[in-house]
Amino acid sequence: MAVQQNKVSKSRRNNRRAHDALVAANPNECSNCGELRRPHHVCPSCGHYDDKEIVAQADEIDLDEDAA
């Protein structure tokens, strides 16, 4: 098991932990469909980013008909 060489003061410990905080998600509204999306990411519901369609949305596929 590892053993520390010297005691780490409360100040040094807290300074090291200063960057460990988690930041809450900050979703934005999609300019095309109005759904919430992550900043700087393609909208998962409509596939648009920066008012351009990046990902073409496929039509609904009925899996039961394809299996038969």
Swiss-Prot record:
GO terms for molecular function: structural constituent of ribosome. GO terms for cellular component: large ribosomal subunit. Pfam families: Ribosomal_L32p. The keyword Ribosomal protein applies. Keywords: Ribonucleoprotein, Ribosomal protein. One of its GO terms (biological process) is translation. Residues 1-20 are annotated as: Disordered. InterPro entries: Ribosomal_bL32, Ribosomal_bL32_bact, Ribosomal_zn-bd. Gene3D superfamilies: Single helix bin. Belongs to the bacterial ribosomal protein bL32 family. HAMAP family: Ribosomal_bL32 (MF_00340). This is Large ribosomal subunit protein bL32. It comes from Ruegeria sp. (strain TM1040).
